[in-house]
């Protein structure tokens, strides 16, 4: 199904934004290498432009890429009935557009929460998402944000097919164990032995980096390094789905590596706590950047 596309270019870096589908950065290509995940059903998602009340609905509308989950994240609840937040799939309004930058706006159905977000390609090698959330209502509101930044495509698949895999450089942080739905669990958390080197044998797994000392994670493939840095978000979720899940809709075909800065170190949603209480007129501002550099020894 077609959706209006905005193409941004900065030298060797090309990004495509879909305003009608959560303002998602649906693809990012650097020097001919596609970096962001793309689902097998990306050409025929269901009911695009609508928020989802369940994980199954959300996944069926997800083409892949990088989008903002807001003003809630993770599982739905009575206070926030949308999986991954109402803004993650619904249309945004374009307010500014140039060759390397687009600015967009979104407001909640009750107009209480207003989000201003921009995508900008920088120096032919970086993309930056800058976001400001404002509570325009008369009462305080709990807010959760997550950058649903999912690497995949050639960046991941070529590394897996070569046998070298993808390695991660992680900051010092507390690791928190989560189940595959993102819910906290008493299991021993996966630490460096799982996340430092990812291959076809890596199980489907989710972990949280709680209060990292440095807000930076690098993913290394044989061709390039993608370094994600962020500010205004205290934690990050890590998600690996490298063909390990064989049940529908994954069918062993989805290659996704999530590095997801977030306000909240779990996927339990507003009902699970961990949101930021925004009073009337208060704002929350965040910045997340993905920088592409050649792998060591590459020009």
What are these regions (language model features)?
Residues 82-97, 202-273:
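Acidic/His-leaning functional-site neighborhoods
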Residues 49-91, 281:
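Extended, compositionally biased flexible segments
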Residues 1, 9, 76-124:
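Extended, loop-rich substrate-binding clefts of extracytoplasmic carbohydrate-active enzymes
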Residues 105, 116-119, 247, 273-278:
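Beta-strand-rich interaction surfaces with strong enrichment in secreted/lumenal proteins
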Residues 1-59, 105, 212-235, 282-297:
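Beta-strand-rich N-terminal accessory domains
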Residues 8, 24, 106-153:
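Acidic, contiguous internal or C-terminal segments within carbohydrate-active enzymes
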Residues 258, 263-299:
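C-terminal structured interaction module
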Residues 150-233:
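Active-site/ligand-binding surface loops and adjacent short beta/alpha elements
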């Amino acid at each position: 199904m077609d959706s209006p596309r905005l193409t941004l270019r900065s030298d060797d870096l090309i990004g495509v934004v879909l305003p009608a589908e959560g303002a998602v950065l649906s693809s990012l290509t650097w020097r001919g290498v596609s970096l962001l995940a793309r689902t097998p059903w990306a050409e025929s998602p269901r009911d695009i432009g609508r928020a989802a009340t369940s994980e199954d609905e959300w996944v069926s509308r997800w083409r892949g890429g990088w989008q903002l989950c807001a003003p809630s994240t993770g599982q739905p609840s009575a206070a926030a009935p949308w999986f991954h937040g109402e803004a993650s799939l619904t249309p945004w309004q374009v307010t500014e557009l140039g060759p390397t930058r687009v600015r967009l706006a979104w407001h909640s159905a009750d107009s209480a929460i207003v989000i201003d977000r921009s995508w900008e390609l920088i120096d032919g090698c970086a993309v930056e998402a800058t976001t400001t959330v404002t509570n325009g209502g008369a009462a305080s509101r709990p807010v959760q944000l997550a950058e649903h930044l999912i690497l995949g495509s050639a960046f991941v698949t070529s590394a897996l097919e070569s046998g070298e895999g993808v390695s991660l450089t992680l900051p010092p942080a507390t690791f928190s164990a989560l189940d595959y739905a993102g819910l906290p669990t008493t299991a021993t958390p996966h630490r460096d032995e799982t996340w430092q080197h990812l291959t076809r044998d890596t199980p489907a797994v989710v972990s949280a980096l709680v209060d990292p000392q440095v807000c930076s994670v690098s993913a290394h493939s044989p061709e390039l390094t993608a370094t994600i840095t962020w500010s205004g978000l205290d934690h990050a979720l890590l998600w690996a789905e490298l063909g390990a899940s064989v049940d529908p809709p994954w069918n062993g075909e989805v290659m996704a590596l999530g590095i997801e800065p977030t306000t909240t170190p779990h996927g339990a949603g507003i009902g699970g706590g961990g949101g930021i209480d925004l009073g009337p007129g208060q704002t929350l501002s965040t910045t997340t950047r993905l920088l592409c550099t050649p792998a060591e020894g590459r020009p």
